Structures are given as structure tokens and as C-alpha cells.
Swiss-Prot record:
NCBIfam families: F420_mer (TIGR03555), PRK02271.1 (NF002619). This is 5,10-methylenetetrahydromethanopterin reductase. It holds the Pfam family Bac_luciferase. HAMAP family: F420_mer (MF_01091).
Length: 328
């Protein structure tokens, strides 16, 4: 089992670099940095991380091919690979409609866009002259002026078609899920995609990009996770909620509370233990270890400790290192 950790560059880059260095010291394998227009730039942040760490792999978790042209993404991640001494990984997904609506960007044909973008980025990274007349991605003899070496590409994927595509074309897949029930479905879709193109499914790094909250006090861990879990519930397809026995009405109540900024209700009772169980890896080190082992048994090969990580971020990173990574 590999271990990653996610940081959101709402914090200054040097603060994230401190946490990344601490994560490296605690045995984490990957640091993933989110990419949203309203936070600090992902590649600027990754540059700071590259200069302040030595061995941990660093990557975007995840960028997309709507706000950034694939040629620009290829140049950016190739630069990170060069600065970091070959430690860069690229996380690329379809993005999210709410962000694109806010930016005035049309979200068209995400499956075709993602597939074509990955092919173009691979060709750019390999030093090829790229000429494509794809359904969504088009180039006419574009080429980077430098070679990057091999950079693994991970796909952010949720739905069955995206998961199947990840099995076909990606080195890894970043799945926003925390529960074995969701990975039973996801692993099968990835396997289907891999076998379609003659790949060994074990070549794909199946990553649980999870809401994670750890503390020796389980109540503190749960309280830290509630707001993040609320947003997950509000954005989950009804089919996923049904899988976990959560009603559409409960989803609506949580969505309404978020829209009103009523976080007191979320902390009070709207976010139930059932939701915490379904949509997070949460609790004491022993609780988290049990869930990780359950996920490993299904086929998960990397755990990413995503927001909030814990009520005290520094303490949580050290707890994961000492009580989970060291023992696995």
C-alpha cells in the first residue's frame, strides 16, 4: 500500500511546503495539490514543494483540460519534473461543472476531452510534434522544446465510463471515495477498461482519494470531518447515496443548509454517523487502519489522506506516519 496526502493551496505555498516535508519524513509517498482558480496556482505551489522536499512524489490532484490547454499542462508538469529531479506526477480529470459555470466555460464532452488530452500530453512529454484533429482536442504541429522523461498520468474519475477509460489509458486513477462498497464497483470498471485494451489491471494504481480525519479522540476526528462529508453528500449522485442507505431527502436538507451557510446544523445532527461511515476514513488510528485494510483487500493500492486530514493537521500527519504507515 502506498500513501499520499492532499493539500489545498488556500494556505500559502511555504506553509504547504512545511507540511509536505513533514509528510515526507513520516513516510508518505505522494503529495497531491488541488487545482482551483480561487486558490494559489497549483504549479507555483508544486515548484515550492519541489525545492523543499527530496524524495516524495508531487503532483496535481487534479487539474483539467478546460481551464488549461493540454500543451500548457504538458509544459507545466514537465517543468515540475525537471525541477524536482523526476518526481512529478500528473493528476488530470474532467473538472466540475460548478467551477466552469462560475468561469463562463462550457463543459462539453468530458470523456472525449479527457481521453484526447491524455494522449496529447503524453506525446508532448515524449518530445513528439503533436498534430491532432480530435473531437475536442486539436493541434497542428505543436511541440515542446525540451523532453521531460516519463511522467505518470493519473485520472480523476468517478462515473463508470470515466473509470473504464482510466483502466484503458491511465497509470493510476484518483477516486473520491472512502468505502469498500464504492470500490467494489470502481475496481470492476477499471478492470473492464484495462482488459479491453489488453492491459493487466494490476498496472493501474487504484487510489482512494478520501476525506480523512484522524485523532486519538474519535469525537474530535468526526467533528473535523463533518463539513467535508456534508459537501460530499450534497454532491453525490442518488445512486451512490442509495448504495449507502442515505435518503435523497437527507441530501436535500444538507444542500439547503450549505446554501444558507448554516454550518451549525451540519455540526449538530444533519451529518449522521452513517454519512461519516460512508464518505470518510475517520476516527482513531485503529479505526482508520481497519478501513484501509478493508480497502486494500478489495484492490485499492494507494490511500490519499484528503481534507481535513484531522482536527490538528500536523498532529494528524505524525499519527498517520507513526500509527499507520510504519505499521503497514
Amino acid at each position: 500500500m502506498k500513501f499520499g496526502i492532499e493539500f489545498v493551496p488556500a494556505d500559502p505555498a511555504l506553509k504547504i511546503a512545511y507540511y509536505a516535508k513533514l509528510s515526507e519524513q513520516q513516510g508518505f509517498d505522494y503529495v497531491w495539490i488541488t487545482d482551483h482558480y480561487n486558490n494559489r496556482d497549483v504549479y507555483s505551489t508544486l515548484t515550492v514543494l519541489a525545492l523543499n522536499t527530496n524524495s516524495i512524489k508531487i503532483g496535481s490532484g487534479v487539474t483539467n483540460s478546460y481551464t488549461r490547454n493540454p500543451a500548457i499542462t504538458a509544459s507545466s508538469i514537465a517543468s515540475i519534473a525537471e525541477i524536482s529531479g523526476g518526481r512529478a506526477v500528473l493528476g488530470l480529470g474532467p473538472g466540475d461543472k460548478a467551477t466552469f459555470d462560475a468561469m463562463g466555460i462550457a463543459w462539453e464532452k468530458p470523456l472525449a476531452t479527457t481521453k484526447e488530452a491524455i494522449q496529447a500530453i503524453r506525446d508532448f512529454i515524449d518530445g513528439k510534434k503533436v498534430s491532432m484533429d480530435g473531437e475536442m482536442v486539436k493541434f497542428a504541429g505543436a511541440k515542446l522544446a525540451f523532453k521531460a522523461g516519463k511522467i505518470p498520468i493519473y485520472m480523476g474519475a468517478q462515473g463508470p465510463k470515466m473509470l473504464e477509460l482510466a483502466g484503458e489509458v491511465a497509470d493510476g486513477v484518483l477516486i473520491n471515495a472512502s468505502h469498500p462498497k464504492d470500490f467494489e464497483v470502481a475496481v470492476e470498471q477499471i478492470r473492464k477498461g484495462a482488459e479491453k485494451v489488453g492491459r493487466d489491471p494490476s498496472e493501474v494504481d487504484v487510489t482512494a482519494y478520501a476525506c480523512f480525519s484522524i485523532d486519538k479522540d474519535p469525537v474530535k476526528a468526526v467533528n473535523a470531518a463533518k463539513v467535508v462529508v456534508a459537501f460530499i453528500v450534497a454532491g453525490s449522485p442518488d445512486l451512490v447515496l442509495e448504495r449507502h442507505g442515505i435518503s435523497v431527502e437527507a441530501k436535500k436538507q444538507i444542500g439547503d443548509a450549505i446554501a444558507k451557510g448554516d454550518f451549525g446544523s451540519l455540526m449538530g445532527g444533519l451529518v449522521t454517523p452513517q454519512m461519516i461511515e460512508a464518505f470518510s476514513i475517520c476516527g482513531t488510528p485503529e479505526d482508520c487502519m481497519k478501513r484501509i485494510k478493508d480497502l486494500e483487500a478489495i484492490g485499492v493500492t494507494q490511500i490519499v489522506a484528503g481534507s481535513p486530514i484531522g482536527p490538528d493537521k500536523e498532529k494528524a500527519i505524525k499519527l498517520i506516519g507513526k500509527e499507520i504507515i510504519a505499521k503497514m
